[in-house]
């Protein structure tokens, strides 16, 4: 029987097992702020490593970059963020609650059975008309008395240096992409890459969201994994399809079920004026379908804007054809926190065992699991041998060492945090140099030589 997966269960497990804690908790917390605990930081790092492995290490096209969070203000003027990076904001006059008008509309669409609920690209007038026509009341107080819809810029503003004036004004970056665009020429020249090629980056971004929520799904501080793939104009739709398929298969290969994913291609009315195509990979979260991965064909918009604003030549000269052009860009953009949450939800399970006992187990792909194995001596008299095994294997893998409690309880603890293998050291180990290794998913056990453990674990990490 399928287990009911709720956000309450996921949040409780994350907090109780050290995946994610509420931020600033001893001071009463900070709304929508989360800290990754000992298991969470290992897990999230594994998610990032998996992405980097497939999108940089194993790709002949792509190279990496780590650009600064703080950039010249003119970067954001050129990109359009200073003038247009905003959400439609409205307040309830009765209870003073604040909402994104487009999210009120989309929630209403979802509640009324719309297969695709989106108000992307709607004007303030369209949003207001829909809210009034459908009598959408305030979710907090049930009244319908709103302020006019206005634009709210999502960037966090700060100042550089000791003076707070227009010259020292700057922003925390709302996306990592612009750092890639402004480094396009430098990366292309030094890496000697020819179009088509991509620049990948993992890094923190910040958005002053009006209505963050759903745990780590939407937060004001978040981490992105973005690729900007530069291609020749006219080949962009072909590359857009290539990266759509590549991203989809990345998720499937890490144990996300296809039935919990859908590919949604944006209609013409949703597309940005500069985009030839945009597609979202959506995941079925406990609270409904939510965007996981955006794959956008941004044409030459970004490089052209920076070329125009900076006065620098950002075109590319094809040495073979002697043709000069501004490359088009395909952008697969993924939130590390959001996809990590999806992996946790996908992995969560409750299994009823013989005798009515229930075990909570996280069926994480071994490549993502915080610990690849746990070393479990049956007796503290076996600690020395167990620590020797730990010392050798820990050179290759992140391991847990647990010698307290019954072996059954220790198995359950490891199941709940997603550890793929439990390695039991018993008194026979001292004689035959063998251990018992238990599989998390099947709970089956087998006896193998200590010398075979490394290859045994390593084989399961491939994807």
Swiss-Prot record:
Q: InterPro entries per the record?
A: aa-tRNA-synt_IIb, aa-tRNA-synth_II, aa-tRNA-synth_II/BPL/LPL, Anticodon-bd, Anticodon-bd_dom_sf, Gly-tRNA_synthase/POLG2, Gly_tRNA_ligase_bac, GlyRS-like_core
PROSITE patterns found in the cross-reference section: AA_TRNA_LIGASE_II
Carries keyword ATP-binding? yes
Q: Where is it localised?
A: Cytoplasm
MF (Gene Ontology): ATP binding; catalytic activity, acting on a protein; glycine-tRNA ligase activity; protein dimerization activity; transferase activity
- An annotated GO BP: glycyl-tRNA aminoacylation
**Entry keywords, A to Z:** Aminoacyl-tRNA synthetase, ATP-binding, Cytoplasm, Ligase, Nucleotide-binding, Protein biosynthesis
For binding substrate, which residues are annotated in this chain's numbering?
100, 175, 222-226, 331-335
Specify the enzyme's EC class, one word.
ligase
Record's keyword annotation contains Transferase: no
Pfam families, per this entry?
HGTP_anticodon, tRNA-synt_2b
In terms of Gene3D superfamilies, this protein maps to: Anticodon-binding domain, Bira Bifunctional Protein, Domain 2
Q: Which GO terms describe its cellular component?
A: cytoplasm
Reaction equation(s) it catalyzes: tRNA(Gly) + glycine + ATP = glycyl-tRNA(Gly) + AMP + diphosphate
Record-listed E.C. numbers: 6.1.1.14
Positions annotated to bind ATP: 207-209, 217-222, 291-292, 335-338
What this protein is reported to do is described as:
Catalyzes the attachment of glycine to tRNA(Gly).
Q: How does it assemble?
A: Homodimer.
Q: Which family does it belong to?
A: Belongs to the class-II aminoacyl-tRNA synthetase family.
Q: What is this protein called?
A: Glycine--tRNA ligase
Q: Which gene does this sequence derive from? A: glyQS
């Amino acid at each position: 029987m399928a287990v009911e997966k709720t956000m309450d269960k996921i949040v409780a497990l994350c907090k109780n097992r050290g995946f994610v804690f509420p931020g600033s908790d001893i001071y009463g917390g900070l709304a929508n702020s989360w800290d990754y605990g000992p298991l969470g930081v290992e897990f999230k790092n594994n998610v990032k490593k998996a992405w980097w492995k497939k999108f940089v290490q194993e790709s002949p096209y792509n190279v990496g970059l780590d650009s600064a969070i703080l950039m010249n203000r003119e970067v954001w003027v050129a990109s359009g963020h200073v003038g247009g990076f905003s959400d439609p904001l409205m307040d309830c006059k009765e209870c003073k609650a604040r909402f994104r008008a487009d999210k009120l509309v989309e929630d209403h669409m979802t509640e009324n059975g719309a297969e695709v609920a989106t108000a992307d690209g709607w004007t303030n007038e369209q949003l207001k008309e829909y809210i009034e026509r459908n009598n959408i009341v305030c979710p907090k107080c049930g009244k319908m008395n709103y302020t006019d819809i206005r634009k709210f810029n999502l960037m966090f503003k700060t100042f550089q240096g000791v003076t707070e004036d227009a010259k020292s004004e700057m922003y925390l970056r709302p996306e990592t992409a612009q750092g890639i665009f402004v480094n396009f020429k430098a990366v292309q020249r030094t890496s000697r890459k020819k179009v088509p090629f991509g620049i990948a980056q993992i890094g923190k971004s910040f958005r002053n969201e009006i209505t963050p929520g759903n745990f780590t799904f939407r937060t004001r501080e978040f981490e992105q994994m973005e690729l900007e793939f530069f291609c020749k104009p006219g080949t962009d739709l072909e590359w857009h399809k290539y990266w759509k398929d590549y991203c989809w298969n990345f998720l499937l290969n890490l144990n996300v079920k296809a039935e919990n994913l859908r590919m949604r291609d944006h209609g013409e009315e949703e597309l940005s004026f500069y985009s030839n195509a945009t597609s979202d990979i959506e995941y079925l979260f406990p609270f409904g379908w939510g965007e996981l991965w955006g794959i956008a064909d941004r044409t030459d918009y970004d490089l052209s804007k920076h070329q125009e604003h900076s006065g620098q030549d950002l075109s590319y000269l094809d040495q073979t054809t002697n043709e000069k052009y501004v490359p088009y860009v395909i952008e697969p953009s993924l939130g590390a926190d959001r996809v990590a949450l999806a992996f946790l939800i996908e992995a969560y399970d409750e299994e009823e065992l013989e005798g009515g006992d229930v075990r909570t187990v996280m069926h994480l792909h071994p490549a993502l699991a915080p610990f690849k194995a746990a070393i479990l001596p049956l007796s503290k008299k076996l600690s020395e041998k167990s620590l020797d095994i730990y010392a050798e294997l820990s050179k290759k893998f992140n391991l847990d060492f647990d010698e307290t409690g019954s072996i059954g309880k220790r198995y359950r603890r490891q199941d709940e945090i997603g550890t793929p293998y439990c390695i039991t050291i018993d008194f026979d180990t001292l004689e035959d140099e063998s251990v018992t290794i238990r599989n998390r998913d099947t709970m089956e056990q087998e006896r193998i030589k200590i010398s075979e453990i490394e290859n045994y674990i390593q084989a399961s990490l491939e994807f």
